[in-house]
Regions:
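Conserved, single-site charged/polar hotspot
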Residues: 1-327
């Protein structure tokens, strides 16, 4: 079974693994006060406690110029199970769970092939949310087992298996979000997302709050007095925004504004901005970058009778299912 190197933690200071305190030292690191060199491995296959996580497989801690790096060496199928419980509701349809299992497995192999120095994936939502043992729900175990080894391929290689919570009715293409076209990641209409809590959302900001959020980006506008949505992408997402403030004006793209305000606050770039008495109201739909499979859209398809193969074919046209061992 393929193994993955999952970055669990990076810290400038001490970290705790299995009840042992590991501390950076001048010549490497120390465990419980004893020098052990630049690399230390936990004994056994776990589960090991690493900060808030309990993980299977091996754990290694390496001294880096910035402190300590904790990496979990875990089997691909165990990794898939541990992500599913963090990505989907446990009571969702079995076919949705299986579609997500294939995507989690495919994304992991895609990232592994990129050859990052020291690890394959991060454990947070910049890659996939990895829950360790706590993510291993019964539904996750079943979906992993029933799709064991299956991945999506395009021209014989694992695809960029992108997904998001909900699309707001239409997915985005890879070209409009990441600036490069991907044949199997085009925009498509999505039905059945009405049950998503993010079908319609709104959030308020004062002009002062907006101005402060932009300061780290180098846009020192003071109190924001006007927000103008400029260009939109083909799927309707905000591409550019102009902001006027008491200390100047600035322009940035919609994704940068979303990140500055919090990607779980402004849940997507499919929004419009309205003025209010004390500032601005962002009114939008969907949650996430919008590329690839909508999880809520997949769940709607499953409830209507689609199996996981049909779900994946709908969201990733031109790809094929195969077993990783066959590659």
């Amino acid at each position: 079974m393929p193994m993955l190197r999952v970055l669990v933690l990076e810290s400038a200071g001490p970290v705790e693994v299995g009840g042992l305190l590991l501390t950076p030292a001048r010549s490497g690191l120390s465990v419980a006060g004893k020098p052990v060199g630049a690399l230390w491995r936990a004994q056994g296959d776990g589960p090991h406690e690493v900060g808030p996580l309990r993980v299977r497989g091996e754990v290694e801690v390496r001294r880096t110029p910035d402190g300590l790096r904790v990496v979990n060496l875990v089997g691909l199928e165990d990794y898939v199970t541990a992500t599913l419980g963090r990505e989907l509701y446990p009571d969702w349809h079995a076919e949705t769970q299986k579609a997500q299992a294939v995507l989690a497995r495919t994304f992991a192999l895609y990232r592994r092939s990129a050859g990052n120095a020291g690890f394959d994936l991060r454990s947070g939502d910049s890659d996939q949310v990895y829950g360790g043992v706590a993510g291993e729900t019964p539904a996750a175990r079943d979906a992993t087992r029933e799709t064991s080894g299956e991945v999506l391929l395009y021209e014989g290689q694992p695809i960029l298996a992108a997904y998001h919570s909900s699309s707001g009715g239409r997915t985005a293409s890879a070209a409009e979000v990441w600036g490069r076209p991907v044949p199997y990641l085009e925009s498509r209409r999505v039905e059945g997302e009405e049950d998503s809590p993010d079908t319609y959302w709104r959030v308020r900001f004062t002009g002062t709050t907006l101005g402060r959020a932009l300061d780290p980006l180098g846009l020192h506008l003071g109190r924001v007095t006007e927000v103008r949505v400029g260009a939109r992408t083909a799927s309707g997402r905000v591409q550019s925004v102009e902001l006027l403030g008491t200390a100047g004006r600035g322009e940035l793209d919609g994704r940068a504004l979303r990140e500055a305000l919090g990607h779980n606050v402004v849940r997507s770039t499919l929004f419009e901005v309205r003025e209010s008495d004390d500032g601005f109201v962002f009114v939008g739909s969907g949650h996430g970058h919008g590329v690839g499979m909508s999880q809520w859209g997949a769940e709607a398809m499953a409830r209507e009778g689609a199996d996981y193969r049909q779900i994946l074919a709908a969201f990733f046209p031109g790809t094929s299912l195969a077993r990783a061992a066959e590659r």
